[in-house]
Structure formats: C-alpha cells, structure tokens
C-alpha cells in the first residue's frame, strides 16, 4: 500500500515542490544464544575474537548448520508483521570481498526468502496513521568488524559479530517524510521487542537501518534512489533523510542527474557523503549455497509458533481502549513499550482492586514518565513500583490528598523514601488535605477580609477567582481540598 503525499509533506525547492520517497532495509539482530550457523556465543561486548568458531572464521572443511531458534524467530517476526510465511526458502551465497568477511561471501536469502509481503500500521501523529508495506524478510549472516583505531599502521579484524543471525526487513517505498520514517522504525522496533526476536538496541548495533531516499515532482515516476548505510539512531534517520533529500533537490535544480549510489551520513557535519556506486543484484553473483539444503517446514509448525505469540502492540492498544476506556493517544503511549504496558496493568489491578484506569494512565504518562526520561530509563525500569502508584492514585481518588500534594509525595518517593508506601508518607508528614468545611471557610474569610479591592475585581471579572484559590491554598500549605475552596469562594463572593 503506497501513501499519497499530503501538500504539507512536500518540500519546496527553488523551482517548485518535490516529494520524498523513502524505503528502508532494517537489519535486526536475532535474539539467540548462538549464531546462525555455529554454536558460538552472540554475547555483546566480549574481548575481540572471543566468540569465534571455526565456522565463523571460515576454516577449510567447516560446514554451516542452521540454528533452529533463529528460524523460529524469523517466522514469529513475519507473523507479527502480518506477512506471508514461506514454507520453503533457500539460502544463497552473496559474493563480495571485504576484510571482515572471512568466507569471501555472505550467506543470505535472495530469490526465496523465509517471509514474504506484509504490512505495518504506523501512527505518525495522534491524528494520522499510515500503512507501510513489507516487501520481504530474510535471514542472513552478519559480517565481522574492522578496527582502524587500535594501531597507527594497520587495521585489525574482530570476528565476534561474524555469523551472528540477522533478519533483513525490507519495506516498500511507502514513506513520504522523515517523520513517517522515524515512526515506522519506532513501531517496527516495538513489534520486535514484544515478540522477543530482537532487543532493538541501536546503540549496540542490534538494529541498523539502510535508508533509501529519492525525490520527484508530485505525480512523476520514482526518481533515482540513494542508499544511506548503517544509520544507527532514530534521530539520525530523520536527519539523514532531510539532508539527502535537500542534496538531491539541489542536484536536480542545478540541472544535474542524481547518481544511484551508497552514501554515508555524517551527523557531525550534517551531510551525506558518497561511499561507492550502488551495486545491483547481479554484481553479487548470487547462487544457492551448496552446503545448505532448502529450508522447509509445514503449516503446523507455523501455527504452533503463532499460538505462542504474545499480545502484540496493536491488539493491546485496542484492548486498553475497550477495557480501560483510555483515549487512543494514551493507549498508544503506554503500549509503545511492553514493560510499561505491563506496569500500567499491574498498577491498575494492584491488590485485586480496579482503580481509575485513566488516572493511573495520567500519572504514568505524565509525572512518572517525566522522571523516567530525566534519568534515561523507561517507567518500568525506575525504582517506583506499580503498587506505589496504585496507592498514590487511591489516595487521590478517596480525597485523602489532592493532585498537588500527590506530586509532593511522588517527589519524596523519588528522592528520599524510595521503598515507602505513599499512605505512610502522607500520615507521617501530615499531608492529608483539609476537607473540614469550617477550616476552609475560615481561611476564605481571612483572605477576603485582607483583600477588599480584589473582591470587587473578582465580582466584576470572575476569572480572578483563581487568584483567591491560590491564596487560600498558600495559607493552608497546599492541603485544602481545591474543589471545596472553589465552592466556598463562589458562595462568599457571589459569583
């Protein structure tokens, strides 16, 4: 499914409007203890060449043996992408030379991938959703890593990554802006994490993006694309697209022709640079790997894996809307991270109760999320427990504390009494809100008596009521029930 560019998504050039066309190839490292064709560990961060088998090093006579878990993870991912699962696929040799590719070829899948066409629903904004088509998903080996900063006179090779299983997920050219591309990668990463087939840690190289960018006049055929290799953050993906699109528009408007090539994004300089001319499939001389039989399984195998899938983000979002009455936006924010979604449900249901789901969502997506972001964690990774949030919400709901006092209690939970029950904090520190109407009436009378000029202003301009509320709250140390204060002031001021 191809989206049609909205006028707001067109880029203005010196000679008119242009449309960006974006497709992506995502390389997702498969979550597996061992590599695709060997038993070597996939652990990240080991000493150079600590996790290398004879197969990974391409020693003569060593034959590859397929890792069944990697196959299962690819099928699970295909199911999560609503894609066609191919019951027969073939591994091919992709021939090219590079120092960190010891075999002289990469084992990949060309004509017969394990997963065919699928689709991903992507929320670009609270009011816009697009469908991005998936062209294919195939399994392949990762290469090693060349190290150029260990010696002044030579380059070294680390083969720890050599042979690690990758899923290459190829999208159709259905994206029309950097915002759409960022949202697509974010959604795809969420799906992979829910399934457990890739941890999605871009900073460790577990998820890398090759971004294909072209530009055209609206309504014209597709332009010549350039591939930006190995973009390693969602923010950089957006920047790379913007920079490359502007570069191509400049070439066209200067009367030149965009050359099909592979480019590198330099975030420091804010530019893309040419690496090499873009290879075509025939340049790699693909042919079936003679050391590996075709990969075949039956529908029962696929059905078994499908039955074991967790609830995926879209289904969870719809359930949160239906079961908890959440707005679509709140539900989308919560399900974007599986652990946060689980945390939310644990807080709502803590102690066997079912407290106000919207109030819990407000706290998790508001103050708690703000704290988590400030320390670089997700909500679920903080020390604040679901039970503590449940207790805090209960105190607000039953009128024990106001929302303002609740913020103070949360601050205490964050900085001081990290394991405390909010109820205990409220009792120990005397933070119960004042609900006694007599005490509130006395505070209101005192403020009115001290500010006769403000009384006249408020009676002429009711919006002044907020000033009086603030003064009463200040006098009561923020403990007065805000609604009771409002009601008392309106009665006394006659507004």
Swiss-Prot record:
Record text on subunit structure and interactions: Heterotrimer of A, B and C subunits.
GO molecular function annotations of the record: asparaginyl-tRNA synthase (glutamine-hydrolyzing) activity; ATP binding; glutaminyl-tRNA synthase (glutamine-hydrolyzing) activity
Organism: Methylocella silvestris (strain DSM 15510 / CIP 108128 / LMG 27833 / NCIMB 13906 / BL2)
Gene responsible for this protein: gatB
Family statement drawn from the similarity comment of this UniProt entry: Belongs to the GatB/GatE family. GatB subfamily.
Protein name per Swiss-Prot or TrEMBL: Aspartyl/glutamyl-tRNA(Asn/Gln) amidotransferase subunit B
SMART domains membership: GatB_Yqey
Record-linked PROSITE patterns: GATB
One record GO biological process: translation
SUPFAM superfamilies recorded: GatB/YqeY motif, Glutamine synthetase/guanido kinase
InterPro entries: Asn/Gln-tRNA_amidoTrfase_suB/E, Asn/Gln-tRNA_Trfase_suB/E_cat, Asn/Gln_amidotransferase, Asn/Gln_tRNA_amidoTrase-B-like, GatB, GatB_C_1, GatB_Yqey_C_2, Gln-tRNA_amidoTrfase_suB_CS
HAMAP family found in the cross-reference section: GatB (MF_00121)
Domain of life: Bacteria
Catalytic reaction list: L-glutamyl-tRNA(Gln) + L-glutamine + ATP + H2O = L-glutaminyl-tRNA(Gln) + L-glutamate + ADP + phosphate + H(+); L-aspartyl-tRNA(Asn) + L-glutamine + ATP + H2O = L-asparaginyl-tRNA(Asn) + L-glutamate + ADP + phosphate + 2 H(+)
Alphabetized UniProt keyword annotations: ATP-binding, Ligase, Nucleotide-binding, Protein biosynthesis
Function per UniProt: Allows the formation of correctly charged Asn-tRNA(Asn) or Gln-tRNA(Gln) through the transamidation of misacylated Asp-tRNA(Asn) or Glu-tRNA(Gln) in organisms which lack either or both of asparaginyl-tRNA or glutaminyl-tRNA synthetases. The reaction takes place in the presence of glutamine and ATP through an activated phospho-Asp-tRNA(Asn) or phospho-Glu-tRNA(Gln).
The enzyme's E.C. designation: 6.3.5.-
């Amino acid at each position: 499914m191809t989206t049609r560019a909205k006028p707001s998504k067109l880029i203005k050039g010196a000679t008119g409007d242009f449309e960006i066309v974006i497709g992506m190839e995502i390389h997702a490292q498969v979550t597996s203890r061992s590599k695709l064709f060997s038993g070597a560990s996939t652990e990240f961060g080991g000493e150079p060449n600590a996790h290398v088998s004879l197969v990974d090093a391409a020693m003569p006579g060593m034959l590859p043996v397929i890792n069944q878990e990697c196959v299962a993870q690819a099928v699970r991912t295909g199911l999560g992408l609503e894609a066609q699962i191919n019951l027969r696929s073939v591994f091919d040799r992709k021939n090219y030379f590079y120092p960190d590719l010891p075999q002289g070829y990469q084992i990949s899948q060309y004509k017969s991938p394990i997963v065919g066409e699928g689709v991903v629903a992507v929320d670009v904004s609270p009011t816009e959703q697009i469908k991005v088509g998936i062209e294919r998903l195939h399994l392949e080996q990762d290469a090693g890593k060349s190290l150029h900063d260990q010696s002044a006179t030579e380059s070294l090779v680390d083969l720890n990554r050599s042979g690690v299983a990758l899923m290459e997920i190829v999208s159709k050219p259905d994206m029309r802006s950097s915002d759409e591309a960022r949202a697509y990668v974010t959604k795809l990463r969420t799906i992979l994490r829910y399934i457990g087939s890739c941890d999605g840690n871009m900073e460790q190289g577990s998820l890398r993006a090759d971004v294909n960018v072209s530009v055209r006049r609206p309504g014209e055929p597709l332009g010549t694309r350039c591939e930006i290799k190995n973009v390693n953050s969602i923010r950089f993906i957006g920047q790379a697209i913007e920079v490359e699109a502007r570069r191509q528009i400049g070439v066209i408007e200067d009367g030149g022709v965009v050359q099909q090539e592979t480019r590198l994004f330099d975030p420091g300089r804010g530019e893309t640079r040419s690496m090499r001319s873009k290879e075509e499939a025939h340049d790699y001389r693909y042919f079936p790997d003679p050391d590996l039989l075709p990969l075949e399984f039956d529908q029962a195998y696929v059905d078994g894996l499908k039955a074991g899938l967790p609830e995926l983000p879209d289904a969870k979002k719809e359930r949160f809307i239906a079961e908890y009455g959440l707005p679509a936006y709140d539900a989308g924010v919560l399900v974007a991270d599986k652990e946060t979604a689980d945390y939310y449900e644990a807080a709502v249901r803590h102690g066997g109760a079912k407290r106000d789901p919207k109030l819990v969502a407000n706290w998790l997506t508001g103050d708690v999320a703000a704290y988590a972001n400030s320390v670089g964690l997700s909500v679920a990774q903080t020390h604040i427990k679901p039970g503590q949030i449940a207790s805090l919400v209960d105190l607000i709901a039953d009128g024990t504390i106001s929302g303002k006092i609740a913020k103070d209690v949360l601050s205490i939970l964050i900085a001081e009494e990290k394991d405390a029950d909010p109820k205990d904090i409220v009792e120990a520190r005397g933070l119960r809100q004042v609900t006694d109407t007599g005490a509130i009436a006395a505070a209101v009378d005192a403020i009115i008596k001290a500010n006769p000029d403000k009384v006249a202003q408020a009676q002429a301009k009711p919006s002044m009521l907020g000033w009086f509320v603030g003064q009463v709250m200040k006098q009561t140390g923020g403990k007065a029930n805000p609604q009771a204060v409002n009601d008392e002031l309106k009665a006394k001021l006659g507004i």
